[in-house]
Design a protein with these regions (language model features):
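A short glycine-rich, Lys/Arg-flanked "PGG" loop and its adjoining helix->strand segment in the class I
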Residues: 91-104
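Conserved beta-strand signature within the Rossmann-like core of class I S-adenosyl-L-methionine
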Residues: 103-111
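Short alpha-helix
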Residues: 131-147
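Short catalytic micro-motifs in class I SAM-dependent methyltransferases
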Residues: 80-84
Length: 169
């Protein structure tokens, strides 16, 4: 079982800002749709929304659904998750969601590993942050642009994260 990321201090401020922007870009407070938070961690998004969404994480303690591909979701959120997957795994995940619901929309937060993220890791003593990164920012963006239509985006949240609201082409 893998550990979910724990946020405190300045990293919690950063993370909550990202979630606020995800909620805003998807108008998530004002809709009644079936939402999946893929990589939910400690369910911060659900707490901020103050409404029930389905949560799924590599840490099974947070899972509320066994097979995410058997449920028809309207919106799936990947926040700082795709970077831990190989490019083929990312493509396969999108293919499986496409087979289930061609109208599914996604809100994807992509972290940038840059000078500021290195400073933040050192300030917060979170030296292992992004340790398991497999797919780069450019790898993730390339897959999104090839398979998705970008509906909205918010760039440079604290210069370290871009958020894309997309749907299948």
């Amino acid at each position: 079982m893998s550990q979910v990321t724990k946020y405190n201090g300045i990293s919690k401020v950063y993370f909550k800002k990202i979630l606020f922007e995800i909620i805003k870009i998807g108008s998530l407070k004002n809709i009644n749709k079936n939402i999946l938070d893929y990589g939910c961690g400690e369910k911060y998004l659900e707490k901020m929304l103050e409404k029930k969404i389905l949560n799924y994480d590599i840490d099974y303690r947070y899972n509320e659904i066994k097979d995410i591909y058997k449920t028809n979701f309207d919106i799936v959120i990947f926040n700082h998750v795709l970077m831990y997957l190989k490019k083929d795994e990312i493509k396969n995940i999108f293919k499986r969601f496409y087979k289930k619901n061609k109208n599914c929309e996604f809100i994807i937060g992509i972290g940038k590993q840059n000078f500021l993220s290195i400073i933040l890791k050192n300030i917060t003593f979170n030296f292992r942050a992004h340790e398991g990164t497999i797919s780069s920012y450019n790898d993730q963006l390339q897959i999104i642009k090839k398979n998705m239509e970008i509906l909205k985006y918010k760039k440079n949240i604290f210069f370290m994260t871009d958020i894309f609201y997309v749907k299948f082409k």
